[in-house]
Amino acid sequence: MFRLENMEQVVSLAGLLHDFGKFTNRSSNYVENIKNKEYKTFKHPVLSKEFVCFLEENNIIESSELLENLKELVLKHHESDIFSKVNLSVKNIENEKLQRIGNIIASSDNYSASERRDEPVEYNKENINWMTKPLNPIFETISLKNDVNENKTSNFAYKLNTLNYEAIFSKQLTKETNKDSFKGNREEELYKHICNFFEEIKKIDSNSYDIFFSQLYLLMEKYMWCIASDTQINISDISLFDHLKSTSALALASYKYHKENNILENGAQPSAEIEQFKVLIGDVSGIQNFIYDGIKSEGAAKTLRGKSFFVKMVSDAIALYIIKEFDLSLTNIILTAGGKFYILLQNTEDSIKK
């Protein structure tokens, strides 16, 4: 069991867990099992807070004032009054400073979900069950002729599974389920998937925040990579994990920007007009020469794989070192591939100097 030590940890976790309830509310069986608890509603923000309480009840996170702040930020993370009847918007946070931090979480959620669109979203017209609608691949919306019809529906989707090399290939959506196709997620599969996640979470035993965050992050990726973030649109091709990861990265970088510029202490509200973020791009040079130099025909494939793996490990190690120096989290590493890495930073003078 570990204890939260600072608001940076709270903000990073709040971003990662704010929409966790969109994972558990996909199963009516799961929701039914917790209805004995005294909640006025079982909307996804309430289920997100329920997960934080689960971590506390299972002695994974120690009770503290910071943990109570985390519960409040996860519960009230919407700018709009979409849940006004049950007081789940940011403006319902009573503590003024915490409310300003709540606005950072809400803004980061909006940035990640692209909720501020110039054009209205075309919502699902086929009355597909939002609870069982699977994640669609992005490939059907790729076009070299720029003639993608945004109102079309997807013919392929990912089957519900933990992340593995076989599961990453999408299946055709049909009226019947067989080896090469299926008609969508099923309630019993969703419930089992969620229960398996919770069983693995219970095994986390660490007195270190960093170790806990890494384990939580990897388990969320393992189970939520195939869960669609938004199931109200025709093609749901953004996973819940990717939305939560990017929200966490944006929230932490934004919080550090506002904190280092004393914006929160001065009582000012976070603003979308200021440039809060920087993207650091790194490139490990000389990769091609390193990989192909001295390659012999015998055992060439094994040597190439080994050298490619080494390059990946080097770029990962550099990225991890950088986020440690900037006091950021795993979520701030946007991508590491091909000897390159992309990291989301706060746009501050201190960051630029580093």
PLM features per residue range, with description:
Residues 298-326:
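Surface-exposed, low-hydrophobicity interaction/linker segments
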Residues 345-353:
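Helix N-cap motif at beta-to-alpha junctions
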Residues 1-52, 156-160, 167-233, 237-259:
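Acidic/His-rich, divalent-metal-binding segments that scaffold phosphate/diphosphate chemistry
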Residues 319-343:
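Conserved helix-loop-beta segment at the catalytic/binding core of cyclic-nucleotide signaling proteins
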Residues 280-289:
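Catalytic-site or vestigial catalytic-site microsegments of nucleotide-handling domains
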Residues 1-150, 157-163, 272, 292-304:
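Divalent metal-dependent catalytic cores for phosphoryl transfer on phosphate-bearing substrates
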Residues 275-277:
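Conserved catalytic motifs of the protein kinase core domain
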